[in-house]
């Protein structure tokens, strides 16, 4: 049908006869000559139709509506100098049409404009419902092509490094991995269910037991969890696993892989090694294990000085094993008013939404500190000097403080830090601050259930523990750090991985530590334990979020802008109306009966 696409055309094609296909982006009638911007997946080409080219042809052109699908045949001409459009690649050319065929009309008015000339800020719900039209606008198509380029660069690099791409099952066993599983009823096994995988974790470990050595997969994963801008119920993961490998070797290899992606897609070179930070350093200085290092405002520990001044809130925080921390906003006295940091203010609310009871503040004015009387009246000159030294605050700076449970203090000051950095435009948008976070704790305490939970997952290998330490194995595991590592970029986790447990008894003990009985271990993970008993090699790996990497490379705010057909924040597909009801006969085949609480 066509022998060229729009943006393939250049001055060397002048005088040639070509066939083009696409959509009418817009039609203009200027003094009897009809101009049409023809759009295809590559871009635009202006086509012209004159009355002298034939009455039938001209009448066809007169009735064309935007988004009509057409095929045109004509001669490529150079545009007059006064009509050159420098905004498109073919802006110096036009096609003088000799023949026009309408391939498809549009039946109804469009729900929103497609042409860049009529572009409007369409509501996302409408864009998701008519995703095929949203794709036609061009921006999303470019995003999908960039995504393809990223995956292509990954595949080429891994293929050249001796990796084998292997597909693992999508219908698998439900195992406790943190989020809820999506369950699939098994018709041939009454009352039993498959689960869609939250990750290929166990299968890739079994591939290492099988001797594959180097594996990767562009894997679909599924998690039934609450959604936000950078999460979807189904998402794409770059999954990597290697045998006979150390933590240092995994980090080094994957750093080169990521650098290669940025070079291939954005033509950006990173010559320096990515910096590293332990989990404890990240929590102490940023309040999060995903620190954004593009700006300052580090958290400072003031518990040693403020916990003893006699202010009740501070005293209780330290007595209860909590923390008193601060962040310093340079020139905050002029940029942030009291209204914003007091109850009802936007910054106060950010801290409150993160679980904090509130915020205390200190304004530095010369050598004096301005704050509420209950704090100020208990500060002497030594206190003031120490506070200024620890916080590195100067005249005109604002110090914000959080006190209480350490986790809540960290979480609230981290959120406030991010909020203020955006508000005061402290973030360099074009900066790529990669960071490896290492030495994660093996476990964290679930305070509600009073039990340990794996911080990453229960297959991470603990550091500096050997099976020979059997008498102290349980105690050592509970307090150990893991051979675990995350790659963070600009405050978002790109990927995470670990060395895996390859000894069956160590794996049993870790699963016991997270609260599983031996019977539960055998029921849920018996196949893995059995495999580890049959000569499993030391192995480890990592998984990267493809959607999130694409989002960051494109500079988008949501991964929905990187996925062809995403779900909304209620996990619904507005295009197909999924999930939906199914027929009674389908449910009967599965022996499922649905009851809905009134």
Swiss-Prot record:
It catalyses: tRNA(Asx) + L-aspartate + ATP = L-aspartyl-tRNA(Asx) + AMP + diphosphate. Aspartyl-tRNA synthetase with relaxed tRNA specificity since it is able to aspartylate not only its cognate tRNA(Asp) but also tRNA(Asn). Reaction proceeds in two steps: L-aspartate is first activated by ATP to form Asp-AMP and then transferred to the acceptor end of tRNA(Asp/Asn). The record marks 30 as: Important for tRNA non-discrimination. Gene3D superfamilies: Bira Bifunctional Protein, Domain 2, GAD-like domain, Nucleic acid-binding proteins. Keywords: Aminoacyl-tRNA synthetase, ATP-binding, Cytoplasm, Ligase, Nucleotide-binding, Protein biosynthesis. The keyword Metal-binding does not apply. GO terms for molecular function: aspartate-tRNA ligase activity; aspartate-tRNA(Asn) ligase activity; ATP binding; nucleic acid binding. ATP binds at residues 223-225, 232, 493, 545-548. It is found in: Cytoplasm. It comes from Prochlorococcus marinus subsp. pastoris (strain CCMP1986 / NIES-2087 / MED4). Its main location: cytoplasm. Residues 201-204 are annotated as: Aspartate. This is Aspartate--tRNA(Asp/Asn) ligase. The gene is aspS. GO terms for cellular component: cytoplasm. L-aspartate binds at residues 177, 223, 456, 500. Its EC number is 6.1.1.23. It is an enzyme of class 6 (ligase). One of its GO terms (biological process) is aspartyl-tRNA aminoacylation. It comes from the Bacteria. InterPro entries: Aa-tRNA-synt_II, aa-tRNA-synth_II, aa-tRNA-synth_II/BPL/LPL, Asp-tRNA-ligase_1, Asp-tRNA-ligase_1_N, Asp/Asn-tRNA-synth_IIb, AspRS_core, GAD-like_sf. Homodimer. It holds the Pfam family tRNA_anti-codon.
């Amino acid at each position: 049908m066509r022998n060229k696409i729009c943006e393939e055309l250049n001055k060397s094609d002048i005088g040639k006869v070509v066939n083009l296909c696409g959509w009418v982006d817009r039609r203009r009638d200027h003094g009897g000559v009809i101009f049409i911007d023809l759009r295809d997946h590559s871009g635009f080409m202006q086509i012209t139709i004159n009355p002298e080219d034939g009455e039938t042809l001209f009448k066809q052109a007169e009735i064309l509506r935007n988004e009509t699908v057409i095929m045109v045949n004509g001669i490529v001409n150079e545009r007059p100098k006064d009509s050159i459009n420098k905004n498109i690649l073919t802006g110096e050319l036009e096609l003088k049409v000799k023949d026009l065929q309408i391939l498809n009309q549009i039946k109804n008015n469009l729900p929103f404009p497609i042409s860049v000339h009529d572009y409007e800020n369409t509501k996302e719900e409408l864009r998701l419902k008519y995703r095929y039209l949203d794709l036609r606008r061009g921006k999303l198509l470019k995003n999908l092509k960039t995504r393809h380029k990223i995956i292509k660069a990954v595949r080429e690099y891994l293929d050249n490094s001796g990796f084998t791409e292997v597909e693992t099952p999508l219908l698998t066993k439900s195992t406790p991995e943190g989020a809820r599983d999506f369950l699939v009823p098994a018709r041939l096994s009454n009352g039993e269910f498959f689960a869609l995988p939250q990750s290929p974790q166990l299968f890739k470990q079994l591939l290492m037991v099988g001797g594959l050595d180097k594996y990767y997969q562009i894997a679909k994963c599924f998690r039934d969890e609450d959604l936000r801008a950078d999460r979807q119920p189904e998402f794409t993961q770059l999954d990597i696993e290697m045998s006979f490998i150390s933590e240092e070797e995994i980090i080094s290899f994957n750093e080169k892989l990521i650098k290669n992606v940025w070079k291939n897609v954005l033509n950006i070179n990173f010559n320096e090694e990515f910096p590293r930070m332990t989990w404890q350093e990240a929590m102490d200085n940023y309040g999060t294990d995903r620190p954004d290092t593009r700006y300052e405002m580090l958290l400072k520990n003031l518990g040693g000085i403020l916990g003893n001044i006699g202010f009740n809130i501070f005293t209780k925080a330290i007595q209860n094993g909590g923390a008193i921390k601060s962040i310093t906003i340079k020139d905050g006295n002029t940029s942030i008013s009291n209204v914003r940091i007091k109850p009802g203010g936007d910054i106060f609310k950010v801290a409150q939404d993160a679980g904090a009871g509130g915020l205390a503040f200190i304004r530095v004015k010369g050598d004096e500190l301005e704050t509420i009387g209950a704090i100020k009246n208990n500060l002497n000159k030594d206190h003031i000097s120490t506070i200024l030294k620890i916080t590195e605050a100067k005249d005109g700076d604002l110090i914000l403080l959080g006190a209480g449970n350490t986790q809540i203090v960290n979480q609230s000051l981290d959120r406030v830090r991010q909020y203020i950095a955006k508000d005061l435009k402290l973030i360099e948008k074009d900066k790529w601050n990669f960071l490896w976070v290492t030495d994660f704790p093996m476990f964290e305490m679930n305070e509600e259930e009073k039990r340990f939970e794996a911080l990453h997952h229960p297959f991470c290998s603990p550091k500096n523990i050997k099976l020979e330490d059997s008498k102290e194995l349980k105690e050592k595991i509970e307090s150990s750090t893991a051979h675990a590592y995350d790659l963070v970029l600009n405050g978002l986790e790109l990927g995470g991985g670990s060395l895996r447990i390859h000894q069956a008894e160590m794996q049993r003990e870790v699963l016991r530590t997270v609260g599983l009985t031996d019977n539960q271990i055998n029921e849920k993970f018996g196949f893995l334990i059995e495999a580890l008993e049959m000569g499993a090699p030391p192995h480890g790996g990592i998984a990267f979020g493809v959607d999130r990497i694409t989002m960051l490379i494109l500079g988008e705010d949501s991964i929905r802008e990187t996925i062809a057909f995403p779900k909304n924040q209620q996990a619904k597909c507005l295009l197909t109306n999924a999930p939906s009801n199914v027929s009674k006969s389908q449910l009967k085949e599965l022996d499922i009966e649905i009851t809905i609480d009134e």
